Amino acid sequence: MEQQPKMVTGWAARDANGLLSPFSYPLRAKGDEDVVVKILFCGICHSDLSTIKNEWGNAKYPVVPGHEIVGVVAEVGSSVARFAAGDTVGVGYIASTCRACANCRDGFENYCAGLVPSFNAALPDGATVHGGFSELAVVNQRYVVRIPGGGGGASPAPLDRLAPLLCAGVTVYCPMRRLGLDRPGVHLGVAGLGGLGHLAVKFGKAFGVKVTVISTSPWKEAEAVERLGADAFLLSTNAEQMKAAAGTMDGIIDTVSAVHDLTPLITLLRTHGQLVPVGSPGKPVQLALYPLQSDGKSVAGSMIGGMRDTQEMVDFAVEHGVAAEVEVIGMEDVNGAMERLQKGDVRYRFVIDVANTMARAR
């Protein structure tokens, strides 16, 4: 007799109003290389909000979002050697890649043309991929990272604060590493102080670099310097401050997701300095070319990170005490959290306590 698929509960959006509610669906059958993860916590990324509201026109309803997952291994497939039941693990944005292209071979799976996200997607065999707003996830072992510190949830940092590292953390960590903005003596600018920006500050200080936060909000100065440990704060609407800081930064991680002119940030860079936009404005941004050309400056793209880099980032974060500032919510509060996220009313990342609240939210 054919075995019936296990039914699990997640929270899904059914249409572009983005309202999430309980959704029962069959868990994908475990393959030989798969890990079954009991989800403990899942962060909420702005791309989750954009997807459930179909802002990018690619929503495949019903959508179970979530790609900042921390959990415990419940089962492993017969060919899995890297993980065992009880291991604490993380799952980020990647569910599958081609494994054959140059990017995959070089550890840059995040740039594979065949990348399948860990939510709102389908695997090459047609199986639907649901995200982390759910009880369980089945993930190929290649796209799972180990959370150091022991099994069953033991870790040097609370697991809820590690969940956002699986997307937001690796998004800012990778370009800092790749472009040499992780060395003592470097002056790093961080534009924007939200979910991505506050982690860029934390990683920068863990690397031992000088960090200046650049923001349009004067009230964020105390937050940046006193709470997060930034060395300086630059109010981008203050012409005198911007002029005084011109040509002083080796690189800038631009986390701003709203449409904005990049030229003022370019003026802050030293010769051969690099601007890395990691926010995702919905429309084209403005950039004057001459300030780039006149001093050999550049704009560098970056998107999340490959699996090798993601594991390295998690290991570094745990060793150096880098963790997100979070507001933990129950699954039943997720729609209110999405509304607040739309308004920018979060400091700095929402994380759902999936394991302890899913049952009561059904």
From Swiss-Prot:
Q: Does the keyword Hydrolase apply?
A: no
Q: What EC identifiers does the entry list?
A: 1.1.1.195
GO terms of molecular function: cinnamyl-alcohol dehydrogenase activity; coniferyl-alcohol dehydrogenase activity; zinc ion binding
- Residues that coordinate or bind NADP(+): 47, 171, 192-197, 215-220, 255, 279, 302-304
Superkingdom assignment: Eukaryota
As to how many cofactors bind and how, the note says: Binds 2 Zn(2+) ions per subunit.
Q: Which residues bind Zn(2+) 2?
A: 98, 101, 104, 112
Q: Which reaction does it catalyse?
A: (E)-cinnamyl alcohol + NADP(+) = (E)-cinnamaldehyde + NADPH + H(+); (E)-coniferol + NADP(+) = (E)-coniferaldehyde + NADPH + H(+); (E)-sinapyl alcohol + NADP(+) = (E)-sinapaldehyde + NADPH + H(+); (E)-4-coumaroyl alcohol + NADP(+) = (E)-4-coumaraldehyde + NADPH + H(+)
How does this chain assemble? Homodimer.
Q: What does this protein do?
A: Involved in lignin biosynthesis. Catalyzes the final step specific for the production of lignin monomers. Catalyzes the NADPH-dependent reduction of coniferaldehyde, 5-hydroxyconiferaldehyde, sinapaldehyde, 4-coumaraldehyde and caffeyl aldehyde to their respective alcohols.
What's the protein here called? Answer: Probable cinnamyl alcohol dehydrogenase 9
| Organism per entry | Oryza sativa subsp. japonica
Q: What is the lineage of its organism?
A: Eukaryota, Viridiplantae, Streptophyta, Embryophyta, Tracheophyta
What is the gene called? Answer: CAD9
